[in-house]
Amino acid sequence: MAASGLKVPEMALRVCVVPLALASLWEMATNAQADDTYGEVKFSDLSGFSYLVGVNAVTAAYALVSILLSSLKPLARYDWVILVMDQASAYLLVTSASAAAELLQLARRGDREVSWGEVCSYFGRFCGKATVSLALHAAALACFVALALVSAFRVLSTTGSSCHPPKHAQAQEHEQGRYN
């Protein structure tokens, strides 16, 4: 499949990222719960959840910009920039997902070795919203992983690069091996 044949799936992935990232952001940013006995918990109390909100905002904004750039006349000189930005977005989504998942795991199970009790039995709605946000975040991550692969394919196909050495390099290696 030629790189130009990936235009529609690429655009569909970019369009999908925006609502996924914004829904994840909204679900987490509005996440707070109060309990008469244990007080209040909100997303901003936990740095991993705040990081997830920030990364969702950045990736949604980048996805919007990349949709606009992609809808304009495709300029090959921006292919590398798009590739790097898609990769960076995927990496940011991975790191924020892992930070949020760790917090959610601690909230659900606690950690007896450091005397942290589980809190989801007291703040169930908070944990539920955090889980939904993390699932939406993971879906946005899957889109960006696919976008990074599409972008890499586009860059490699437009620059004529490949994963294999040129035939003359293979011939030279073969000759050197034969005469050494």
From Swiss-Prot:
**What GO cellular component is one of the record's annotations?**
plasma membrane
Q: Where is this region: Disordered?
A: 161-180
Q: Where is it mostly found?
A: membrane
Tell me one Pfam family matched here.
CASP_dom
Q: Which residues cross the membrane?
A: 8-28, 49-69, 80-100, 130-150
The alphabetized UniProt keywords are: Cell membrane, Membrane, Transmembrane, Transmembrane helix
Protein's recorded name: CASP-like protein 2D1
Topological domain, Cytoplasmic: which ranges? 1-7, 70-79, 151-180
Looking at the record's lineage, which domain of life comes first? Eukaryota
The topology of this chain with respect to the membrane is:
Multi-pass membrane protein
* Compartment annotation: Cell membrane
Q: Which stretches are Extracellular in the membrane topology?
A: 29-48, 101-129
Source species, please?
Answer: Sorghum bicolor (Sorghum)
